Amino acid sequence: MTAQLIDGKAIAASLRQQIAKRVAERRQQGLRTPGLAVILVGSDPASQVYVSHKRKDCEEVGFLSQAYDLPANTTQEDLAGLIDRLNDDPNIDGVLLQLPLPEHLDASLLLERIRPDKDVDGFHPYNVGRLAQRIPLLRPCTPKGIMTLLESTGADLYGMDAVVVGASNIVGRPMAMELLLAGCTVTVTHRFTKDLAGHVGRADLVVVAAGKPGLVKGEWIKEGAIVIDVGINRQDDGKLVGDVVYETALPRAGWITPVPGGVGPMTRACLLENTLYAAESLHS
């Protein structure tokens, strides 16, 4: 058996087309164009690439996009002031603060400064709390995108044993809550977990978001399991690989996401989806 690929690139492209269509309809109706402000502090190369992709996505779907490229020595006070101004700007529906920030800045305080109804990344404690209470509003983009990928397989998630490898605030923890909402029995593993292979081997669905290339071996995967690889790691030879050993997981899994072209495009598409939702449902 060879796993079927979950083509995140194609699914994300379809979602962007739907968003662009809705933006065009809004214009025809005389409604405001959704607006996204993207803040980049410093010159981290990976962050610059991510931000350029997000700005390109905005142009593709017809969003108003405002770019703020700030020097690495920007102060906490100055950055907080910019966020406050964007919070008050009626043309802006979403405020995105690109992470990581320079070490002298307190990311937690700054993320909490973004108004929850403009927190299109879904990182604010208010939005994470709503997800935990089973009344999600703006959902964290990567877990939200993964749920869309899972829906594309047609699999019935109710009662599935799901394992999330990694317990970060951005992916692992909200992912577990999304899977609980979907009816899965969820185990979250982390750096202190004993017998990771045993947990993975019992799972019908594995979501790996640890940021460690090749952490999950293909032979650990249960026959027919769904494997979602969130990791994206650049090797010395420039090749991008995930947290799962793809070549050995492929013959065992039922469905699997490639790296690249799996989860990453969906994260970006869900950022646009959240921004459109904020414009239509929260700021109309």
UniProtKB/Swiss-Prot annotation:
Pathway annotation: One-carbon metabolism; tetrahydrofolate interconversion
Signal peptide residue numbers: none
One biological process term in Gene Ontology: methionine biosynthetic process
Catalyzed reaction equations: (6R)-5,10-methylene-5,6,7,8-tetrahydrofolate + NADP(+) = (6R)-5,10-methenyltetrahydrofolate + NADPH; (6R)-5,10-methenyltetrahydrofolate + H2O = (6R)-10-formyltetrahydrofolate + H(+)
InterPro entries membership: Aminoacid_DH-like_N_sf, NAD(P)-bd_dom_sf, THF_DH/CycHdrlase, THF_DH/CycHdrlase_cat_dom, THF_DH/CycHdrlase_NAD-bd_dom
UniProt-listed Pfam families: THF_DHG_CYH, THF_DHG_CYH_C
Protein keywords: Amino-acid biosynthesis, Histidine biosynthesis, Hydrolase, Methionine biosynthesis, Multifunctional enzyme, NADP, One-carbon metabolism, Oxidoreductase, Purine biosynthesis
EC number: 1.5.1.5, 3.5.4.9
Gene Ontology terms for molecular function: methenyltetrahydrofolate cyclohydrolase activity; methylenetetrahydrofolate dehydrogenase (NADP+) activity
GO cellular component, one term: cytosol
Source taxon at top rank: Bacteria
Amino acids binding NADP(+): G166, A167, S168, I232
HAMAP family: THF_DHG_CYH (MF_01576)
Function: Catalyzes the oxidation of 5,10-methylenetetrahydrofolate to 5,10-methenyltetrahydrofolate and then the hydrolysis of 5,10-methenyltetrahydrofolate to 10-formyltetrahydrofolate.
Family under the similarity heading: Belongs to the tetrahydrofolate dehydrogenase/cyclohydrolase family.
Subunit text: Homodimer.
Name of this protein: Bifunctional protein FolD
Organism listed in the record: Pseudomonas fluorescens (strain ATCC BAA-477 / NRRL B-23932 / Pf-5)
